[in-house]
Amino acid sequence: MRKMLAFVGVLVAFAAISGGLYLAFPVQMSTNLGLARSYLLSLNAPAGTATTQQNPASPASAYTPAVDVDASAQTEDWPSYNRTVKSQRYSQLSQINTKNVGRLKVLCTYDLEKFAAFESGLIMVDNALIGTTQFDIFSLDPATCAENWRTHEDYPPNLLPSNRGPAYLDGMLFRGTQDGRVLAYDFKTGKRLWATTISDATLSESVPSAPIAFEGLVYVGNSGGDFKGGKGHMYALQAKTGKIVWEFYLAPKTDGDAPRGPLGASPLDASTWKNPPGMPISGSGTWTSYTLDTRAGLLYVPGGNPSPDFVQGGPEGSSGREGQNLYSDSVVVLDAKTGDYKNHFHLVPHDWHDWDVSNPPILIQTRGGRQLMAVAPKDGHLYGFDLADSSLVYRVPVTRVENVDAPFVPGKSVHFCPGPVGGGEWNSPAYVPETNLILVGEVDWCYSVTVQDDKTLRGVPRGAPWTGMAALNPFHAFGAADRSSDWAGWVYAVDADTGVWKWRLKSNYPIVSGITPTAGGVVFFGDMGGNFYALDAGNGEKLWSQNLGGALAGGVITYAVKGAQRVAVAAGFTMVAWPTKIRTAKVVILGLDGDTPNQ
């Protein structure tokens, strides 16, 4: 029946396009056609394979007691996008361990009965498991998958229909929307408490990020940096009321920009953007989540690509937006109370490949005593910075990197790796304190891009997609992807002090999901083929795996309910850009066979 519906969807979509409905309803028709396309491309998808390799030149790290375990959250909960606001993703739970993980099994499943770009970073707090879709927020029993409540919101869809999860603070939940708002809900009932607009929907700006919340403030920004005129902003809101406490521009404020709140102090001006007339400064959206150093009071904000994403030129500059294009592709450090600028780390100066800083950085103290910030953007590298002096300690490749210096010229197709949806995506690296290893999941997928000429770029209307790709095919707006039979995924385990990899795992599907190490010596993650894995954290060897029936691109978390450890996974990701199997969005809860919570 599903196959028949998919083929009918193909016919309806093509008929609609030929009748001109695509122009009238581009979001809806792109979504329908994209689902049909994904179905066709995923036919005969192979079973998952995962192969681990040890680095012969660098022996595996010795297991020692943890030196930097962030205790800012209850051990049995997972109360924030990356468990704690320092984003380490490490769990101190150890009931599921290397000796018994082979007994892991699916205990229950909650089916949302919707096709969705299900990227939600799940949270579990106060005996409730919370997640989001593009339009819904829901609360589940974390042991049984029973629905506590589910709240639906109606608003116009966006061409990039994602939501990456909720935040929790003081009995309230917070999420962003596709029409540019932040919404607050009662944790127990799902009743909406307030709504605050923080972006301009007419410029296709939206709020897909998972907020973080701390000491009365909610931190969140907006995306929209792939659309003409869209700019990234970062905000702090009062948790109780939604009032904007401060705002910070991630791209230069220019004539016509209207702040929504008090502006944090910033040295940024337009001098690093030398755009010609008809090419407004655009980009630097922030679209994943954030990291907070609660002791220092510093907020770390990942910034997205400059726009147009692809421009004529290369390493020496371009004709469309000369300069370094600050603060695009940067981690910007702000005073968490005031929004004042403190520092920035510019990872991809003058980006012409669409290589956002696409995930929150992690903050750790390494075994060697260094205070380190590590981050893995879409350029296929893991970066480590010493926070004592902001110096770069290492920049190491963690996926395939090819032909990245080739300039873009109108009329010429350029093939490069990683592509615009390659490298590190929206889930952060993780840290294993016992072995001093940083774990990073990566996408190995190459693209070809042919850029538009400057005259065409200037003619694009404000608020329209502004990638710079010359293509009539709507699925090639962000470049033409290689066949999915040629894609892959990696998990790299890298020494946090040196940047040298200790072990690496290669999957035949991209790895986008959260990566979660535990005190039981186990690492959990999944791939876009729906394969869920448990590895030995010390050497990367596969201990257990199971296909969960849909692409895994969201939260992978672990928590305990009445003393029994559980693992929850967001499964069933479907999106135009990814040729995955078409499955409804689900939350899958796993535990040990025969293990029941304490009464």
Each predicted region: which residue ranges?
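N-terminal Sec-pathway targeting helices
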Residues: 1-14
